[in-house]
Amino acid sequence: MNETECTQCGRIHKHLQEIRNKYPDYHCKPVWGTGSLNSRICIFGLAPGLHGANKTGIPFTADFSGQLIREIIEELDLDEYFITNVVRCYPEKNLPQTSEKNNCQTYNFQELSRLQNLKVIITLGEVAYRQIIKLYDIEYNTHKFKHGNVVKLNEKINLISSYHCSKLNINTHKI
């Protein structure tokens, strides 16, 4: 994927310029997925964290959620995985608008189509879940989000839904 600055979402683009002024060393550009293209597992979160991937340019790094998910991956001894977000840029207050989520669907499709051995997609949070089932033309009304649910996306790929590993969800004992 390309590291160029995206201007497709005007609100996010403006917000990233403000963040760049405050934190000149931050990445403040689209954050693309990373990991093995031979992976059978792909993990989708919501969006880069302000002081995480938005800072480093690498998904799930430098913040609470990143540290937690990477500890879990290490504990599970996963050698090959791919990790990304359904929204590529940090949205204001970490709340992407519908148009911003939809603007990234092309990138979600592109990243997934590069993973030829993919068997399982894990979504962290309901927003990621909704975007992925939408990508596979599955109706939310018939497949509502539920932590731990498994949805067959097609003949070779299953989706597992999980609550997001955010500090809020941990501190409120949601997970």
PLM feature spans:
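A polyanion-binding, active-site-adjacent surface
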Residues: 1-145, 149-153, 157-175
